[in-house]
Amino acid sequence: MTRRGGSDAAWYSAPDQRSAYPRYRGMRYSSCYVTMRDGVRIAIDLYLPAGLTSAARLPAILHQTRYYRSLQLRWPLRMLLGGKPLQHIAADKRRRRRFVASGYAWVDVDVRGSGASFGARVCEWSSDEIRDGAEIVDWIVRQPWCNGTVAALGNSYDGTSAELLLVNQHPAVRVIAPCFSLFDVYTDIAFPGGIHAAWFTDTWGRYNEALDRNALHEVVGWWAKLPVTGMQPVQEDRDRSLRDGAIAAHRGNYDVHQIAGSLTFRDDVSASDPYRGQPDARLEPIGTPIESGSINLISPHNYWRDVQASGAAIYSYSGWFDGGYAHAAIKRFLTVSTPGSHLILGPWNHTGGWRVDPLRGLSRPDFDHDGELLRFIDHHVKGADTGIGSEPPVHYFTMVENRWKSADTWPPPATTQSYYLSADRQLRPDAPDCDSGADEYVVDQTAGTGERSRWRSQVGIGGHVCYPDRKAQDAKLLTYTSAPLDHPLEVTGHVVVTLFITSTSSDGTFFVYLEDVDPRGRVAYITEGQLRAIHRRLSDGPPPYRQVVPYRTFASGDAWPLVPGEIARLTFDLLPTSYLFQPGHRIRIAIAGADASHFAILPGCAPTVRVYRSRMHASRIDLPVIQP
């Protein structure tokens, strides 16, 4: 399955698009409002194949977005598109065109409280927003062109909307593809390792607030005001008065960064939690949530039993540099075991627009994302023989080896190979035999992973991910490096680190980076993990969803502050990866006490940390190694 030139092209020779439906050329556009049960009007764009006969019946793709379903060009520019809207997200535009040409209707939706839709947003993915999805499906299946079958998909927020649509258990929805999207809001994006991802909640919150005011130029640049008026009004709204009314309704939208900043633990309840507000403003819960706490009530993991009961097949789709979402895709795949579900993990950034190679940098992917989604959805919706039904359910890409591999589950069978922190900043395969040994590190609170990291990729519709030579940053960190390898070493799965530490503080943030040092001394980033020390307690209790890494609750009742000077054990996982270390290269772990580029710095002065490496307190990293 290796491709020449290091390509990430698919494991099959070419997309097999055999379909029970004919192919079409061109699209027919219309838009309208659909009124929900509470009177809120939701804006919808509909795309049908051009030349569709009145007798034809098609399945539909439902795509619900928080980032505008489309834009309106100013006069006379809009005449260049024949009055049709401007499709501002290139990946969605290509996907829409591909699916419509393949015999699907495509429905774009501005979710409640966003775009040209009315209503206010009291939280993301509210129970009202989820219920809207079922009513929109009802509207779709009533249309004369619909055959009664609906699939849902999307990247990022839109992918989560597709997943939560299944909470309704609507019989028309047979398959979804949540791509590059979260599963557990707390650990996947808002608080990885229990540390507030402050850059994300602040930046994403400000961008959304600007979009909700129809101020696109504040997100993409001042020039955006020149060609567009903003979000696309529906066709009946010729004077844009309805759009203006929707924008006015958005003034009541909530502030995600403010709420996130008020939380520490998974079970914290925000003062502005919409599920516990005044009776006349309180949201009615939906589904059968398994955990309490403000952040859990907007998280897909909390409703996995409802999603499972839908019976819909799910394609969990992500990339190794997609923020924390590769692990999200894994957790979803392992937890929601509906028949026909698949998992794919490629060498991509958020939304898959770039292929990331730790040794060679960025390139455009050869992988046909839209063709792969068509293979999956055609199989489940049209019963087409696309080949996917006979394949193993898991495919993953091993970087450096540049090879797609398959498995029946995740992680693939591996042997744990431990490397121990040792004297002289060495990383050794043999456990220490000394009675004492430690290294002292004064936390450098300026340390960070830069402006083109995996965490920045989550904002800006899939930004570039490129980690430059880490040598300069590593000078700020505590590093341990192995001897040069004498053979290739494939690491696939979840790396786990165990640190024995003392600190001058009662809390702290710990970041561990797995790196590759080449023979010239260049340092390449592979993956990372983090943990806030107050969350260090491991739990033997049943987790809320299936786990294959050390489990902790992140609940307030399990808080465990450090005692200055007392040795504490920190065990946590790094984000999953599949990477081949080459002969002559060295393995490095780098330990930091801050990532100022992305995560909140705890109040107080920079602590001094001691990392122990003795017989009794053997700090180590456990690598899941695939034997050749």
Swiss-Prot record:
EC number: 3.1.1.-
Active-site residue list: S156, D322, H350
Matches recorded under Gene3D superfamilies: alpha/beta hydrolase, Galactose-binding domain-like
Key words, A-Z: Hydrolase, Serine esterase
GO molecular function per UniProt: carboxylic ester hydrolase activity; dipeptidyl-peptidase activity
Pfam families: Peptidase_S15, PepX_C
NCBIfam families given in the database record: CocE_NonD
Family from the record: Belongs to the CocE/NonD hydrolase family.
Full protein name: Putative serine esterase Rv1835c
